[in-house]
Amino acid sequence: MKDDRVMSWPLFALAIAAFAIGTAEFIIMGLLPQVSADLGVSIPSAGYLVSGYALGVVVGGPLLAMLVGKMEEKRALLILMAIFTVGNIACMIAPGFNSLIVARVFTAFSHASFIGMAAVLASRIAPPGKEGRAMTLMFTGMTLANVLGVPVGSLVGQVYGWRTTFLGVVALGIISLLMVWYLVPAKASASKKNTQTNLQGMKRPIIWLGLMTSVMASASMFAFFTYIVPILQDVTHVEPKFASVALLVCGLGITVGGLLGGRLADWSLTRSLVLTLMALIAALVSFYWTSHFVYPAVINMAVWGCLSFCVGMLLQALIIRVAGESANYASTLNVGAFNLGNAIGAWVGGRVIDAGMPLNSITLVAATISLVTLVMVLGMFLSRDRSLLSYPSATA
């Protein structure tokens, strides 16, 4: 009897690895006050740890994709996870702020290639007709990083110091390395086309418009998310330990959004993106007022997290759907696009703070960026290439 279950041991291993990578990426948002105080830099300057990681993803993704692209996928994933683990060891022992930034950038080099390759691999090892749900389950590891990894890591950093948090991330990297080694089959994917054939599909304008849209969506998210703890402490006036609870609630919303995004993509990609972006803009604008009240602010954060990650999943599904045989490359570039937006958003948020504006005004800036994202999405759906959006999920 044929096994039609979406979850499998190889997919579970990929999800755990995604959890480790997501924790490493997002954990710094909950540690900015501790890192700032320990290394003697301002919070806006500490925000460069977010930007530096994101730029490392943008630069390292294409470079490592070329280096490991011809390898058997399991071997490539193991090499990428080893780079990730070594980088987090360097973060843990970094003697100063500059060396910590360098270590974060090095760690980030493996991020885009691993997640991009894992997203496509997840769809390939899934039963026919369930590729989209398999990809969503793999990305659930990233979203769970916000539910468990970021709040727990933030709390550990407050109690035992931020270096102890990075020790935990190193342990996650080692566990992920072992799980990929033992659980992912050596030949889990279909035979690859040659590089030239794969890159031919990247010439379609709709793919690049989709990548630019991912940049803007991510910039909106991280303009707010990077400084969410300082906002909670200085505007909402919560205790530092309660900030971890607020991050946990926000993480639950993010997890729901990640799962919801996969379902909505199967329902109607076009309608879902437009409606979700409209709701996201409303959530960001409302936070400008709810940020002054603890419980409304936390609820608003959870709604925002749900909508933000829902948009991210819809855009990832869009890129894989339209890329066809170029799915590996396009998926890797989309992870890079997301992190380029991460860097831009963190920088924009920092400039808002440096300009002396109220911290919660960052949400209005993020809402404006989301509005631009919505316009770009509408432009994509009106393009001559829009017929590609009706294709089923790729199993390239």
Label each PLM-derived region with a short phrase:
Residues 99, 127-184, 227, 231:
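Helix-loop-helix hairpin linking two adjacent transmembrane segments in secondary transporters
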